[in-house]
Structures are given as structure tokens and as C-alpha cells.
């Protein structure tokens, strides 16, 4: 039987495979013959006639090299050894059966199982897993069915679709029902995720609030430490000045020492004839302005973390309309004045009144705070300077008030009067008395102070010597400008001043440059070296109430309800905008311009995007309850905004 099967083989070779095959590799003669035929056909194809391809010689050489390499015994052993390893053996796991069984039957400890949270959801874990799977397969099958249905239409002739079998409809219904249930599971999962996100956001807001409170406490503690350190430094300086044996030059202030050398040299002969040197040295020297630098290790940053328009603090500062406010830096020291004839010093960090500045005989109309120096201009026609670093608090026993004032303090209804029942003594420096009418505007920088008065004059003061060095007549300058002629670039407005407005509404100086806004709507730029008007800016149709300039622009506010931005390089209007009511106060920083425009909110203008928005208590006021009072004065520094209202309230905002 085996012999007959061997004879029937077309190749004449035996097809009977020994257990180990040829060469012990499991290969049969049929496999070798098939391999030889494939090699022959491939070689014949590659090494065809040389006329068909120019690369035939290269193919012939390559195949000869391959044939020579395959005839080597080492190469044959390597090729035949690969047949002993099946693909299953190559990818088979190296783990033993014992290891696999051990891992399969491993269980979790009871401690971990006890920590599994209880789920109140009505959906199982498997349903949630199925809900997260995409339904692409359903969409593909649905498209295939619809495409097949469309192919049944031939030549554009619509035929009635054959009715589906009930079993198919039931399958479709079950499939749609299952997908609808999965949609419910997915909606529940989305709702849970949204709820978790809301909880995380609420927790973050609470954490941010806690950190802000901590930052506020740190800044308050920092302010107290700096205040105590400043007091100790001042006491040490006072002790050194009062200690006997120190040089006589110590009794003379350092700020006025160099400035008075020329004066002493000129009047030395008169001093010798007037009195002896020993008697002259025993005379008490008047107080001089001593600018002590405030020790500030770091600037407050709390207001930078509030959103714009957020209220920081509100204080009932006065009992009447606020006429002037100013502060040195955010959360620092504020000085406010009102029609109640008081000037109060406040700690913006704690909102506490530190005391009164007493000395004026009438209400203060204007003031400025620069470091520890305060300048106040009053309706009594005087300008007084104060040094807050010398302040010493004493009870206010000489107050002039109503007979029932003490009863109000005992009741505690007026909180700020209890906290502010002290006077700041020893901080008065000197008074500048030369005007004959109320002082309506002032500004000082360095050792120069400019004051404007209702007597229609501007006066330049030397703060070192405490005397007036120059008087500028505004009416004379206006008359001189009107007689120059019609060929001048800047013409006088020709309008009469408003009787209800201040003749000098605002002033600002920088070195030898002075800007002054008056009741005739003119903005005059003076040169203090010559005492002449360098340029006049015409554009406003009402009295100027406020102005401020920097290196490039000058911003002015007027009772004509407009704010104008001037280009100092060209002398022309750069930008302008108006509000519904007259502008009473204005100030700007690097980002925004704020203004008080006769409303219960502060008008804010963003320089970058030219956006207008409101800030103040009037935004959140209830229509039923009483509305906040009108804002009269505004001050802005480094995004920290102060507003003074008509009812005596002063509030701090982020801007």
C-alpha cells in the first residue's frame, strides 16, 4: 500500500514523512521541492533577458551571491532552526501555571473592602461602563441599512418599502430602549461631574477668602510694626537733639542749613551790631520743615487681589460734606477735610481716626499729603504745613460743639467721634500767610509750594525758608494775552468767570513748570523762572475744577461736564469725553481716569480700551431705601480709590 502511494507521486519521490523529517527538522521533500520551484521562478524573473532591462547584470550578480551564501552549512542550519519555533511559542507568557493560578485566586483584604464608599445611584457599575462606550457600531449598521434601502430604488422610481418583520421591529425597539437608558445614565454622570466641579470651585473660593484675610492681618501687623519703629526712630532723634554736649549745628535743621548760609553771610554785619553772638544763640529757633523718610519695607498688595469695583472699607469720616481728601499710599495714612471745620488723620489699614489737625480758623478747601508732610489751604486765607512724624496725641478738651455732644458720645451712636477724640500736637510746622482771600488750590513738590486763591493770584513758596518768593497775577496775565493780537496761536476765551466757581480751580507744579486752571475755562502753563505764561490751552466752556499732568498728557475737568486730555508736546486735544453733570474732582494713574461727576458713583475711564464704567455704592443701592450721597472728591493711587461724599462718608475701593 505504501509502495503504491509512492508510485503515484507526480515527482517520483516519497511523500511519506518520517517522524523527525529530513535533517531532523520536520521538513518533507515536498516542501523542499516547492521552495526550489519558487527560487527558480524568482531567479528567472530577476535574471531575464538583458535586453529588457539594463539592470539585469546587477540582478544576476546579486542572485549568485545569495545562492553562494545559502549553500553554506551555517546558513542552512540557521534557516532550518527557525522552523522548530512556532509563533505561539514566541509570544507565549513566561509565567508558570502555578503563578497564574495564584494571581487569579488572590483576594482583597477586608480593610480595603470596608473603605469602599456606598453609592446611592440606581445605576450599576456595568451600566455606567456600557454608557461610556461609543455607539459607533449602531450608527454604522444604521447607515448600512439605510444605504441598502436606497440602493433598492432603481431609475429614480420610488417603490413601496416592504413591511418589516415583527421580530426586526422588536429588536429595533429593544435596541432603542437600551440606548435611551444609556442616555439617562450619561446625563446622570454629567450632572455628578458638574456638581463635583461646583463643590471644588466653592472650596477654592473659601480658601481664597481665608488667604485674603490672612494677608490683611499680615499687612495690618506690618503697618503697626513700622509705626512703632518710626516712633522709636523719632524718639532717638529727639534725644540726640536734646542731649547736651552736641554741636550747636544740631539745633539748626539740616534742611535749612545750606540754604541759610548765604543769608547769614549777607547779614553778618547787621547781626553783629544788633546783638551779641552769645545772646543770639540762646534765642529759640522756629520750627522748620523736616521731611523724614517713612520707613516702608514693602508696599501693600491686598487691594491687587480684589476684583475691580470691590469695596475695601467705608468710614463715617465727617458730619458734613467732604471738601478735600488725600493719602500717601494704599492702606496708608489719609487726611480728610469737610465743612464741619475739622481736619482728620486716618489709618486706612484699620479705618481708625488717629486725631485732628487743629489750627485753621475756617474750613479747609484743599490739601495734599506727601510722605509725612501735609499741606492744608483754608478759607481763612492761610496755608499750613504739618509733619505727621512729630505727632503726639492728646485729649481734645477745647472742642467747641453742641451742649449735647457729650451725651451722644456716651450713647456710642457716633462711633467715629469716640475714636477721634484726640488732637495731634507737635506736628504743626509753620503757616504761609500772604493771600488776602480763601485758598482754593495748592500743590507742592520738593521745596516748592504753589497756592491759588480767590484773590486772583498764584504764589510760589520756598518751604525751606517758609516765605513767598514770587506772586503771579492771573488777571494781569489774561490782560497781557488779550493785547498781544490776533496772530497768536492761542487766543483768550473771552468768557466771564462764573461767580459760583473758584477763580483758581486747580494747580500743579513740576520743577519750573506750572499748570493752572481758572474760572474762565483757560488752562495756562507758566514758567516759574520768568513768571510768564508759556502757553494757554483753550477748549473748555466752563470753569476748570481739576487738572493733572504727566510727562506727555495733561487731563482737565470742568463744570462744562467734559474731561479733556491734552497733548503737551503738540498743545492740542488728544481725547475728550463728557458726562451728564459737572466735574468736581478728577485724578488718574497709569491705567485709569476717575472722576466725580455729580452722581452717587465714581466715573471710571480705562485708558487701554477706552471703556467707561461706574464704581461706588450707588451701583448696589436699593431703589426702595435711601440712595447714597453724591460723590464730591476722588483720589486714586496704584489702583486704590478713595471717594468723599456729601454726607461725610469716605469709602475705599479697588479700581
UniProtKB/Swiss-Prot annotation:
Keywords: Coiled coil, Membrane, Mitochondrion, Mitochondrion outer membrane, Repeat, WD repeat
Cell compartment(s), UniProt: Mitochondrion outer membrane
Record InterPro entries: G-protein_beta_WD-40_rep, WD40/YVTN_repeat-like_dom_sf, WD40_repeat_CS, WD40_repeat_dom_sf, WD40_rpt
Xref: Pfam families: WD40
Gene3D superfamilies: 6.10.280.220, YVTN repeat-like/Quinoprotein amine dehydrogenase
Location of region: Disordered: 1-22, 134-170, 240-263
GO CC field: mitochondrial outer membrane; transferase complex
Keyword Aminoacyl-tRNA synthetase applies: no
Coiled-coil region list: 199-244
Compositionally biased intervals (Basic residues): 139-151
Principal location class: mitochondrion
Membrane topology reported for the UniProt record: Peripheral membrane protein
WD repeats (start-end): 317-358, 359-396, 434-473, 479-536, 539-578, 580-615, 626-655
Function statement: Involved in mitochondrial fission. Acts as an adapter protein required to form mitochondrial fission complexes. Formation of these complexes is required to promote constriction and fission of the mitochondrial compartment at a late step in mitochondrial division.
Family the entry assigns: Belongs to the WD repeat MDV1/CAF4 family.
Official protein name in the record: Mitochondrial division protein 1
Amino acid at each position: 500500500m505504501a509502495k503504491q502511494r509512492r508510485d503515484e507521486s507526480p515527482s517520483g519521490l516519497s511523500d511519506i514523512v518520517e517522524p523527525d523529517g529530513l535533517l531532523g527538522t520536520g521538513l518533507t521533500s515536498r516542501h523542499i521541492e516547492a521552495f526550489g520551484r519558487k527560487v527558480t521562478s524568482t531567479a528567472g524573473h530577476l535574471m531575464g533577458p538583458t535586453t529588457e532591462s539594463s539592470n539585469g547584470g546587477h540582478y544576476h550578480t546579486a542572485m549568485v551571491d545569495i545562492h553562494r551564501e545559502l549553500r553554506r552549512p551555517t546558513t542552512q542550519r540557521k534557516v532550518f532552526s527557525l522552523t522548530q519555533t512556532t509563533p505561539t511559542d514566541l509570544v507565549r507568557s513566561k509565567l508558570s501555571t502555578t503563578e497564574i493560578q495564584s494571581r487569579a485566586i488572590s483576594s482583597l483584604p477586608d480593610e480595603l473592602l470596608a473603605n469602599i464608599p456606598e453609592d446611592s445611584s440606581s445605576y450599576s457599575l456595568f451600566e455606567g461602563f456600557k454608557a461610556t462606550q461609543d455607539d459607533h457600531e449602531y450608527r454604522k449598521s444604521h447607515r448600512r441599512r439605510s444605504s441598502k434601502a436606497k440602493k433598492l430604488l432603481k431609475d429614480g422610481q420610488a417603490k413601496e418599502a416592504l413591511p418589516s418583520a415583527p421580530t426586526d421591529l422588536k429588536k429595533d425597539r429593544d435596541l432603542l430602549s437600551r440606548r435611551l437608558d444609556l442616555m439617562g445614565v450619561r446625563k446622570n454622570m454629567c450632572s455628578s461631574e458638574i456638581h463635583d466641579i461646583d463643590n471644588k470651585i466653592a472650596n477654592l473660593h473659601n480658601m481664597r477668602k481665608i488667604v485674603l484675610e490672612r494677608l490683611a492681618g499680615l499687612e495690618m501687623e506690618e503697618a503697626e510694626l513700622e509705626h512703632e519703629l518710626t516712633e522709636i526712630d523719632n524718639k532717638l532723634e529727639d534725644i540726640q537733639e536734646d542731649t547736651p554736649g552736641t554741636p550747636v549745628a544740631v539745633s539748626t535743621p539740616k534742611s535749612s542749613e545750606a540754604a541759610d548760609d548765604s543769608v547769614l553771610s549777607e547779614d553778618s554785619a547787621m547781626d553783629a551790631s544788633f546783638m551779641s553772638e552769645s545772646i543770639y544763640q540762646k534765642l529759640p529757633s522756629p520750627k522748620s520743615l523736616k521731611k523724614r523718610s517713612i520707613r516702608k519695607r514693602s508696599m501693600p498688595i491686598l487691594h491687587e487681589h480684589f476684583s475691580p469695583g470691590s469695596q475695601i472699607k467705608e468710614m463715617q469720616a465727617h458730619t458734613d460734606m467732604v471738601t478735600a481728601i488725600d493719602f500717601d499710599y494704599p492702606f496708608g495714612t489719609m487726611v480728610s477735610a469737610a465743612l464741619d471745620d475739622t481736619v482728620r488723620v486716618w489709618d486706612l489699614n484699620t479705618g481708625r481716626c488717629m486725631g485732628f489737625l487743629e489750627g485753621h480758623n475756617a474750613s479747609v478747601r484743599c490739601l495734599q499729603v506727601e510722605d509725612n508732610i501735609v499741606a492744608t489751604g483754608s478759607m481763612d486765607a492761610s496755608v499750613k504745613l504739618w509733619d505727621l512724624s512729630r505727632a503726639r496725641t492728646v485729649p481734645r478738651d477745647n472742642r467747641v460743639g453742641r451742649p449735647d455732644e457729650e451725651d451722644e458720645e456716651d450713647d456710642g451712636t457716633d462711633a467715629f467721634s469716640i475714636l477721634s477724640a484726640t488732637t495731634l500736637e507737635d506736628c504743626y510746622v509753620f503757616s504761609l500767610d500772604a493771600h488776602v482771600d480763601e485758598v482754593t488750590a495748592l500743590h507742592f513738590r520738593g521745596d516748592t509750594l504753589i497756592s491759588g486763591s480767590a484773590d486772583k493770584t498764584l504764589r510760589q513758596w520756598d518751604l525751606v525758608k517758609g516765605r513767598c518768593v514770587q506772586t503771579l497775577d492771573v488777571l494781569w496775565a489774561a490782560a497781557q494775552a488779550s493785547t498781544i493780537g490776533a496772530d497768536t496761536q492761542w487766543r483768550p476765551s473771552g468768557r466771564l468767570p462764573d461767580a459760583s466757581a473758584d477763580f483758581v480751580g486747580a494747580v500743579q507744579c513740576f520743577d519750573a513748570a506750572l499748570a493752572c486752571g481758572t474760572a474762565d475755562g483757560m488752562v495756562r502753563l507758566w514758567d516759574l523762572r520768568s513768571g510768564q505764561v508759556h502757553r494757554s490751552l483753550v477748549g473748555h466752556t466752563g470753569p476748570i475744577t481739576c487738572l493733572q499732568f504727566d510727562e506727555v498728557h495733561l487731563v482737565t475737568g470742568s463744570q462744562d461736564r467734559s474731561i479733556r486730555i491734552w497733548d503737551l508736546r503738540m498743545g492740542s486735544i488728544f481725547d475728550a469725553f463728557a458726562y451728564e453733570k459737572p466735574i468736581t474732582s478728577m485724578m488718574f494713574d497709569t491705567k485709569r481716569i476717575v472722576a466725580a461727576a455729580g452722581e452717587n458713583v465714581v466715573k471710571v475711564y480705562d485708558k487701554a480700551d477706552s471703556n467707561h464704567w461706574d464704581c461706588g455704592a450707588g451701583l448696589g443701592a436699593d431703589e426702595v431705601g435711601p440712595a447714597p450721597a453724591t460723590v464730591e472728591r476722588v483720589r486714586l493711587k496704584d489702583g486704590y480709590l478713595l471717594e468723599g461724599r456729601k454726607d461725610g462718608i469716605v469709602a475705599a475701593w479697588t479700581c
